[in-house]
Amino acid sequence: MGRKFFVGGNWKCNGTSEEVKKIVTLLNEAEVPSEDVVEVVVSPPYVFLPFVKNLLRADFHVAAQNCWVKKGGAFTGEVSAEMLVNLGIPWVILGHSERRALLNESNEFVGDKTAYALSQGLKVIACVGETLEQREAGSTISVVAAQTKAIAEKVSDWTNIVVAYEPVWAIGTGKVASPAQAQEVHFELRKWIKENVGADVAGSVRIIYGGSVNGANSKELAGQPDIDGFLVGGASLKPEFVDIIKSATVKSS
């Protein structure tokens, strides 16, 4: 069975209730490929999660942008996986490069978070990616492999994991990895998973691309054999997010 195309929209720390309502209305009215062609998940800030979930069309789903590494308790400011499950939130994004950089989240911490979220019944979009310095030093694959290894060491079942490759140098910069550059990393990452986790997982796990994806470049990126979708930042707040969702048809044509 082929890997179903996956498009995630990461709204990051953006939006007012009026803006959020506008985006949701736009998505609800959009004509996009059916659920059997593309899986669509949007990730608003915590405060808007129930609002978006209640308003959003039934064939789209919501994700939190983070959750705590273990059971809730005396962890001021954190949100636990159990709380998300209680609210009926099916997905969570973990290990985003902004959190790795700004909040010093280590590979091991992201691995622990992923394992705990999965154990509570959440599905995980697990982010990996290299900085510009790491790319220029020729260590892209080793960096991405180390990030993935930290997850593989804690997780045995990959059914509910989507891996998002986001080169840090391409996030919000307007620079985008060329389709060939992105495909190369996706191919190498899938190969690493095959050799270190198993051929079944490598064949079925979706590896999506993030990093300045927009309506103009999404079709060409979607045409690459190892790119199974996108994690979209800035463009997920704009009408062009609909065009990115439509790029899923490249796979089914």
Curated annotation (Swiss-Prot):
The keyword Cytoplasm applies. Its EC number is 5.3.1.1. Keywords: Cytoplasm, Gluconeogenesis, Glycolysis, Isomerase. GO terms for biological process: gluconeogenesis; glyceraldehyde-3-phosphate biosynthetic process; glycerol catabolic process; glycolytic process. InterPro entries: Aldolase_TIM, TIM_sf, TrioseP_Isoase_bac/euk, Triosephosphate_isomerase, Triosephosphate_isomerase_AS. It is found in: Cytoplasm. GO terms for molecular function: triose-phosphate isomerase activity. Pathway: Carbohydrate biosynthesis; gluconeogenesis; Carbohydrate degradation; glycolysis; D-glyceraldehyde 3-phosphate from glycerone phosphate: step 1/1. It catalyses: D-glyceraldehyde 3-phosphate = dihydroxyacetone phosphate. The active site is at H96, E166. Belongs to the triosephosphate isomerase family. In plants, there are two types of TPIS, cytosolic and plastid. Homodimer. NCBIfam families: tim. This is Triosephosphate isomerase, cytosolic. It comes from Coptis japonica.
